[in-house]
């Protein structure tokens, strides 16, 4: 019997996750100087993380032989102050928000349970739900209506078998937010757990922030992350805000030491450096508007409104998204080809914010590629 005969059938159905391309990969493949490559494909903070983090990391070097604290009181206190949520309603994960997603599936899903996912959206939801035995019921963000959530496609899929519903807002990759009244209607129409993914909420109008709903409703879990505006994608720190009962159940099965000493120190310092946070947020929104307005001038592109640090763009010059993105790669520009997102036609790509210098160079290159 080979290993293929022993691997679970559901695993064989999966395709490997397609991440955004790195500067190093493009430099190798196309012979381009890495310093000249413009990386706008992974929804990162182009200004990086707080400069104060480097010093804090050096303080941890002498302690790397010691296990980290499973629960770091200082980190929990800083997250509590930032979100204005009680510490006992917070759970922190060491693989970004992905760990929180996976742990909630582990405590909720039995074989045959149902999970509702509107698409196109973040692909990790379906991977985690399926691997734990869930049947996926697909809802939709309506392409014909600027990718607004088709709320009826969610409500009509709710059954007694529904254990969880994922709502990404702002949605990745479309960038739009789900109206608060629609989320309220969904939450109040079911006792299934509604996971509101707020990975990009800092870039949105504060009225769209529903983190406090974790205290108002027993069936809400809000996902947050340090990977975006805080510039810590490489440290993999995310967290959830939810009811005390759900936190308790998740702590029973959560990996004990998933947050490293380095990731804890980085997250604490990022939260404390409020000046750098505000700078990155304000300049990030300005960068977003600069790219959006610049791309809107090209007749061969359709650019969708966004409340995140990226925007979805449709190619209308006869190329599909992979062909178009290949042209950009050869010119040293990395954007995200969205062909791998379930529910999208092969004509879309996603552009993240850049520094203002990167934006200027990117838009100049775009003028050479499209009309």
Swiss-Prot record:
The modification N6-(pyridoxal phosphate)lysine is found at residue 228. Its cofactor is pyridoxal 5'-phosphate. It is an enzyme of class 2 (transferase). One of its GO terms (biological process) is L-histidine biosynthetic process. SUPFAM superfamilies: PLP-dependent transferases (SSF53383). CDD domains: AAT_like. Keywords: Amino-acid biosynthesis, Aminotransferase, Histidine biosynthesis, Pyridoxal phosphate, Transferase. InterPro entries: Aminotransferase_I/II_large, HisP_aminotrans, PyrdxlP-dep_Trfase, PyrdxlP-dep_Trfase_major, PyrdxlP-dep_Trfase_small. Pathway: Amino-acid biosynthesis; L-histidine biosynthesis; L-histidine from 5-phospho-alpha-D-ribose 1-diphosphate: step 7/9. It catalyses: L-histidinol phosphate + 2-oxoglutarate = 3-(imidazol-4-yl)-2-oxopropyl phosphate + L-glutamate. GO terms for molecular function: histidinol-phosphate transaminase activity; pyridoxal phosphate binding. Its EC number is 2.6.1.9. Belongs to the class-II pyridoxal-phosphate-dependent aminotransferase family. Histidinol-phosphate aminotransferase subfamily. PANTHER family: HISTIDINOL-PHOSPHATE AMINOTRANSFERASE, HISTIDINOL-PHOSPHATE AMINOTRANSFERASE-RELATED. This is Histidinol-phosphate aminotransferase.
């Amino acid at each position: 019997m080979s290993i293929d005969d022993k691997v679970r059938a559901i695993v064989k159905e999966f395709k490997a996750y397609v991440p955004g391309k790195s500067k190093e990969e493009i430099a190798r493949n196309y012979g381009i100087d890495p310093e000249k490559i413009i990386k706008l494909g992974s929804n990162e903070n182009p200004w990086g993380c707080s400069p104060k983090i480097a010093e804090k990391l050096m303080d941890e070097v002498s302690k790397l032989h010691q296990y980290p604290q499973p629960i770091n009181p200082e980190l929990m206190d800083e997250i509590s102050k930032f979100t204005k949520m009680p510490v006992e309603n917070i759970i922190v994960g060491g693989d970004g928000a992905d760990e929180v997603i996976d742990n909630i599936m582990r405590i909720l899903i039995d074989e045959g349970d149902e999970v509702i996912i509107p698409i196109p959206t973040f692909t990790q939801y379906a991977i985690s739900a399926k691997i734990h035995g869930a049947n996926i019921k697909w809802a939709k963000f309506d392409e014909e209506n600027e990718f607004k959530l088709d709320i009826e496609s969610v409500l009509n899929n709710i059954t007694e078998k529904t254990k969880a519903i994922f709502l990404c807002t702002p949605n990745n990759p479309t960038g739009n937010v789900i109206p608060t009244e629609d989320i309220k209607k969904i939450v109040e129409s079911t006792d299934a757990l509604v996971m509101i993914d707020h990975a990009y909420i800092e870039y949105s109008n504060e009225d769209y922030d529903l983190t406090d709903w974790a205290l108002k409703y027993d069936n809400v879990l809000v996902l947050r992350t340090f990977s975006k505006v805080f510039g810590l994608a490489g440290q993999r720190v995310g967290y959830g805000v939810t009811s005390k009962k759900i936190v308790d159940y998740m702590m029973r099965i959560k990996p004990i030491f998933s947050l490293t000493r380095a990731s804890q120190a980085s997250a604490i310092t990022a939260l404390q450096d409020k000046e750098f946070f505000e700078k990155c947020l304000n300049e990030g929104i300005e960068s977003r508007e600069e790219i959006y307005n610049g791309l809107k001038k090209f007749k061969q592109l359709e650019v969708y409104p966004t409340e995140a640090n990226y925007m979805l763009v449709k190619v209308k010059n006869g190329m599909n998204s992979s062909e178009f993105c290949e042209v950009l790669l050869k010119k040293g520009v990395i954007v995200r080809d969205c062909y791998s997102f379930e529910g999208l036609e092969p004509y879309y790509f996603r552009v993240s914010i850049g520094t203002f210098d990167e934006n200027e160079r990117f838009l100049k290159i775009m003028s050479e590629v499209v009309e």
